[in-house]
Curated annotation (Swiss-Prot):
Record: residues binding Zn(2+) 2: 140, 175, 379
Catalytic residues (positions): 80, 174 (proton acceptor)
Protein name (database record): Peptidase T
Organism: Vibrio parahaemolyticus serotype O3:K6 (strain RIMD 2210633)
Cofactor descriptive note: Binds 2 Zn(2+) ions per subunit.
Family matches, as CDD domains: M20_peptT
InterPro entries listed in its UniProt record: ArgE/DapE_CS, Bact_exopeptidase_dim_dom, Peptidase_M20, Peptidase_M20_dimer, Peptidase_M20B
Main location: cytoplasm
Gene that encodes it: pepT
Gene3D superfamilies, per database record: 3.30.70.360, Zn peptidases (3.40.630.10)
Amino acid sequence: MKHLVERFLRYVTFDTQSNPHVAQCPSSPGQLVFAELLKQEMLDFGLSDVTLDEHGYLMAKLPSNVDYDVPPIGFIAHMDTAPDASGKNVNPQFVEDYQGGDIALGLGDEVLSPVQYPDLHNLHGHNLITTDGTTLLGADNKAGIAEILSAIAMLIENPDIPHGDICIGFTPDEEIGRGADLFDVEKFGAKWAYTIDGGPQGELEYENFNAASADVIFHGVSVHPGTAKGKMVNAMNLAAQFQVKMPADQTPETTEGYEGFFHLKSGELGIARSELGYIIRDFDREGLEERKALMQKLVDEMNAGLKHGSVELNITDSYYNMREMVEPYPHIIELAKQAMEACDVEPLIKPIRGGTDGARLSFMGLPCPNIFTGGFNFHGIHEFISVEMMEKSVLVIVKIAELTAKKHG
């Protein structure tokens, strides 16, 4: 445990921001550089089957220390950070024994305020690690990596703690939805696994959104504005008309819990051609289909009213709710709950308003719920993490390994 924070601070110095505009895997060279460091650390630990492929998938195994059969289990985290904010030159700040109030981030005007982020009210007395207000922190998901390796170190240093084979996997490009694309489940070797990619202490998640992306392309007619009457069709106006027809009360900023949404995420505007990029989210598969059908209906209605110009819709499913793949194995969830309770952590079972590698992996034959890291406000400059919650995550990982062995002994 003594090296947990040191590991984390070392890991966040690596710029591993993934790039959605690059097709190759990994999408950024920094991820491979970071993977090489982690590979060497795992070799130094004496782990077996340490492999790093050309795409940045890093795997290893801590062999069983018992003389009876225990199902191999896995722990997974991702090496990339989100494209939403810079992950270069991360300069973490320490806030020891936080007692409330605003936290100044660096030398600028940015602050971390409990008014805006009420979770801080519950963290009095905690040691916090924040950003300096210019980058994200990278707790998503380098905290998960540090916690997994710290748990492995604890198991190695305490051979009296029984465990079966522990499989470790670190993936690239999770933040751009590709983390499971080239993951070799058979090679990984676990019967089930846990991603260590959640937020506050106690989070245990085995439900996530069903997800799709939608590109709406508006084809206009460009004519010199001086002679445009009755001829021009401005694709930007078509795009604006379409967005106005979308449900205003079903967006990320107006929904919570099990409520789905449409999210206008990107746009390219021009007279002859405009394009709007959406993501569609719903916890129910039928609800996802209804949302897709609504967008198609709006497109069809617009096309029916156009004499010139047209609207085109392309929808691609991204991932599905892992619940249907995890629920048939209730012992996986029960084991994590028991481990948390044994570590004085109250399990907080809640849906993931997003996705994880585990969602895709669950549909690839590796049931894979998600467990907390202790981090908050991922993907932005107000990201921070509690050291005490990081330590609890390590203990929960160790306890899961121990309970798995004891239940099969």
